[in-house]
Amino acid sequence: MRSLWVFPQNLFLLLILVLDPNQIWCLDPPRPNFVLMMVDDLGIGDLGCYGNKTLKTPHIDSLASQGVKLTHHIAAAPLCSPSRAAFLTGRYPIRSGVYGTGLTMVFLFNAGSGGLPQSELTFASIAQKQGYETALIGKWHLGLNCENRSDPCHHPNKLGFKYFFGIPLTNLRDCHPGHGTVFQFHIYLPIKTFAVVLISTFILYYFGLLPRVFVIGLSSLAAMVTCFLAAFLLVVPYMNCILMRNGEIVEQPFSTMNLTQRMTQEAVDFMERSAEKPFLLLVNFLQVHTALFTSADFRGSSSHGLYGDAVHEVDWSVGQILQTLDRLGLSGNTVVYLTSDQGAHLEEVSATGERHGGSNGIYKAGKSTNFEGGIRVPGLVRWSEKIPPGLELHKPTSNMDLFPTVVQLSRGQLPQDRVIDGRPLVDLLLGESQSSPHEFLFHYCSARLQAVRWSPQHSDSVWKVFYFTPNFYPVNSSGCYHTHVCFCSPNYVTTHNPPLLYDLSLDPSESRPLGPDTEPDYHHIIETMAQAVRDHRASIKPRDSEMSVGKLLPKPWLQPCCSSITQFCQCQRET
């Protein structure tokens, strides 16, 4: 009898020795699928599961009840491009170069040469090496080409996503007729300045203080500049509003009509054709970023105008994706995650005065700021086979934590040649740890370190210190309504020395800054965080910004074009 057992035992050992380790993963419990969803500019106060009583989000609320709700989930940056770079790489944007310079803090043109460097590793690229089918549906906003149109070095296909259907830039006001332009500050300020100069010039000429030739020359220059700016606004939709399938342009400019339904169907189709393999699907919604749009089925469905209608449509899409997992029998072993790239954009107001930004609930300020309203975002995680339903976790977590979490669960290896700032969430989600994976989180405004968050071990306190804060306008508001977003340059901020200190566990609205007279440990807390800053800065290797003027400005030879210049690059290859 013993000889009968030895043969299969030896055969099993022989198989282990002969087969590639990556080919025998099926001998272990199956690895989970991943469905990761990121809504654009969604405020934490827009969802029923986070306290909203007037918007209907039943599918998202159901997702929250079936898994874990993270109540202290932090975006690594308060703006689209840097936040998404950090999410994909698990690294602060200062490390990858995806940080702003001057008054520009996101990528603005498809024809720029900046983007997420190919040297960066995304969780998708590691999952792909582990045998996962990978796809990105929706918004990218991390660059496209480098040297020419045949060099898509920043394209999602080059950074781990085998399949891509979406927009390489972002949903701009310019992409939807009648919604104005995202370049309003960059263009209207020069126009207003020119108008003041012209009026002053004519007054001086009227009183004989300037010669006529000077007035004629300045007027001609103003006319040329005005014509150039008008032409620029005319071509922006053709330059920037592009829909792609992998490397091919399918619409230029894209139509928002039923676009969410189309992208939802793309997500469903991908899951259906990948159901027999492990897969990673990232759905980056174009909504609820402006220009706001929604299909006819949802128009007028909310009491919050077009913004609320768009939230309803996103919730419907989430429901379709979750129902597909149920239908395919994949819900149990699929990690589902939903978040926003940053807080709601409070300064978004339409030309008619309708509010086009969402709600950040009790949290101060919004998008473009490192106050809680700008970076505290929804964080919902469901893994039905492993995580019990109805949990709430109040410890600080970061959207950077998805990188090491995906790597761990896909049985990949974290890179050893770079700093990874994210921390795996597995132990916290499974109840095997009760502590935040982060003792410190660092909050940048472009390249400037603005704030630090400290979660001491064995304490419920969460301290947050600000070294400078934006100058809000109007003064008593919580936004920068004169510039549409808050900037980081010295002229737009107030420096604090000593720093502002808040205890977020007692003051989540950041309304009561503490000092030595109100916090006995003030000096100890400030010095502890100062030392953390010194240690953190020592780990930063200088890297040029991918948003420098040279990389940011559009270059004709990089402009994607699916027809010809004489046709304004227009095409519609799919209906």
Locations of the language-model features?
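Long, internal low-complexity/basic segments
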Residues: F12-L14, I24-P32, V39, I44, ...
